[in-house]
């Protein structure tokens, strides 16, 4: 997992961590049917500002926008947030070896949600917090993401 805690840990943090609802406020407004237009307005100002605030390199921002910088692609990306509203069978623990890479400067996922993920993994689990790294760890510090990921995959081949 990269930057996203287990859903049950996240839901608990929404209830118990006074900061988590504010960190996740964008989840609600991305449900608006016009969200695609809003995030892409003014040459994708919202997206660019968010990524820059998280110290994502300009080249990576341009690469992201080359893929999601149009309405259909952005609608698909925002679909992840919209799908969370759908009721599914209760989610239980994860039963596969799990590596969770999380930046401790993540502005959307707090420490309580991140550290709480361990309770919902019923398999070998490694928590790899990255000091000073934000939500977009793969863009900020790719080598600090790929190294533990490759080690995890070597230990747990698919």
Language model segments and positions:
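Catalytic histidine-centered segment of alpha/beta-hydrolase-like enzymes
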Residues: 133-146
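Flexible "cap/lid" subdomain of the alpha/beta-hydrolase fold that forms the substrate-access gate
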Residues: 1-129, 150-157
């Amino acid at each position: 997992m990269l930057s996203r805690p287990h859903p049950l840990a996240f839901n608990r943090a929404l209830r118990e961590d006074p900061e988590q609802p504010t960190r996740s406020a964008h989840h609600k407004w991305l449900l608006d049917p016009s969200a695609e237009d809003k995030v892409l307005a003014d040459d994708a100002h919202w997206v660019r500002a968010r990524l820059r605030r998280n110290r994502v390199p300009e080249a990576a921002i341009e690469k992201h926008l080359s893929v999601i910088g149009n309405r259909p692609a952005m609608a698909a990306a925002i679909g992840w947030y919209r799908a969370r509203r759908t009721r599914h069978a209760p989610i239980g623990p994860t039963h596969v070896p799990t590596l969770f890479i999380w930046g401790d400067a993540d502005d959307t996922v707090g420490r309580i949600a991140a550290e709480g993920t361990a309770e919902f993994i019923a398999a070998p689990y490694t928590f790899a917090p990255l000091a000073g790294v934000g939500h977009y760890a793969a863009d900020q510090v790719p080598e600090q993401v790929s190294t533990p990921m490759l080690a995890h995959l070597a230990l747990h081949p698919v």
